[in-house]
Each structure stands twice: as C-alpha cells, then as structure tokens.
C-alpha cells in the first residue's frame, strides 16, 4: 500500500492525506462528555485552568463548564501587542465574570504580559496566512504557559476557549494540548466548544452582556489581514 502511494503524483498524495485526516477526526465533544460523566457526582469539584482569549469566546465556555468545574480563567495573550486592546479585552473578561451567574466559583488571573516573547517566538513567520504556521506557534506558546501554570498550582485539568471559534482548528489545538499534557503531567480537557451551537450561544451571550467583539484575533498580523480583507 505504501509503495503504491509513493508512485502517485504529489497532488494525489495531498488529497489522500486530507481525506484520511477528515475520516479519522476525533469527536472532541464526545471526549469532553466522557470526562464530565466521570467527574459528575463523585463529591469533589475538579479545578480547571481555562486559558481565555477574550470575553465573547469565554462566555459560552464558562456557562457550560462552571456546572462541573471550579474554574480559574487564565488570561495569557502576549500576541495582543497593542496595550490598549489587551487591557480592554482583559477588563471585559473581568466584567463578564463579575456579572455571570455560576454554579461553582470562577476567578480571573492574568498571565505575564510580554509581547516581545510572542514576536520572538513567531520570528520568520510574519507573512504566514492567518490559520497557518504562525498561528500554530501562537497556540503552542499560550497553551504551554497554561500547562506550566496548571501543573505548578495543582490544577486537575487545563484547556482553552480557542476551540469555540469556527476559524480555529480544534484538531490542532487538542493535539497540542495533549502533547503538553504529557510533557507536564497535567490532564488536558479535550474540547470543541463550537459543537452543539456553542459559537451561536456565545454570540447571544455577548449581546446579552454587551461585550466588546473584536474583528481580529489579536496579533498585529491578524489585524493587518483583517484590514486588507475589508478593503
């Protein structure tokens, strides 16, 4: 089989690889369901470190997960290099948490804000398209910080709100999370929050709480691409 594939043109191999990956995608919502079923009714509420990118994306995730976890929001986003934008998104997250009703405690902590770390980490990838290699590195930077913090502070799980976006690759995010879970010895909570209309629910909650909804992901490169697309 492998020898046969090696004789095919490159475009055939690419098509085959894409087809194979699409047929073997993991349903991460079902993985999350299994964890929730396991922890429900055991008498102890597990501690979850939830990496949050912005208030709108976190709205549904918090509504959903706070039924089962004691959550600490980890706002670590050095990719947002414009300080005013960063501070506004952080203040909106804090405001949302102060307003939403939760079954279990939710608090917000801020990770170290050093945009230079982000620029050094993605150096050479400045002209990559949105969703490409630069974004993959950005995911890894933020999730690695989350994994390290979760391990050092005794959390039971860590995860991110990033999978709620239709523009973010949940397969990639969960793959990175699982890799870091093994590296740091802290369980990764699988997710695909856009499932079960989670993204639509986040839009409803954003309107309900009058949340600031930015039109770009966060870095200056995504802002550049957003402006280009609008023109």
What is each residue range found by the language model?
Residues 2, 6-8, 20:
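Low-complexity, intrinsically disordered or signal/transmembrane-proximal segments
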Residues 12-13, 19-60, 65-231:
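Nucleotide-activated chemistry modules centered on ATP-dependent adenylation/adenylyltransferase
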Residues 6, 13-14:
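Intrinsically disordered/low-complexity terminal segments and short unstructured peptides
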């Amino acid at each position: 089989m492998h020898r046969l594939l090696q004789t095919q043109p490159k475009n055939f191999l690419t098509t085959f690889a894409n087809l194979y990956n699409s047929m073997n995608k993991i349903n991460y919502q079902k993985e999350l369901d299994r964890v929730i079923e396991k922890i429900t009714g055991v008498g102890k509420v597990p501690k979850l470190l939830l990496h949050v990118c912005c208030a709108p994306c976190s709205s549904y995730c918090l509504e959903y997960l706070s039924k089962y976890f004691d959550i600490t929001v980890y706002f670590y986003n050095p990719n947002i290099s414009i300080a005013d934008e960063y501070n506004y998104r952080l203040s909106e997250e804090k405001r949302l948490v102060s307003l939403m009703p939760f079954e279990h405690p939710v608090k917000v902590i801020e990770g170290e804000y050093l945009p230079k770390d982000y620029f050094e980490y993605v150096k050479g990838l400045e002209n990559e398209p949105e969703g490409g290699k630069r974004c993959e590195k950005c995911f890894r930077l933020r999730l690695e910080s989350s994994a390290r913090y979760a391990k050092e502070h005794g959390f039971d799980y860590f995860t991110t709100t990033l999978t709620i976006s239709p523009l973010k690759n949940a397969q990639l995010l969960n793959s990175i999370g699982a890799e870091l879970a093994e590296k740091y010895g802290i369980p990764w909570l699988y997710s695909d929050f856009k499932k079960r209309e989670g993204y639509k629910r986040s839009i409803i909650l954003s309107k309900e709480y009058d949340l600031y909804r930015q039109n770009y992901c966060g870095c200056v490169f995504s802002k550049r691409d957003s402006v280009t697309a609008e023109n």
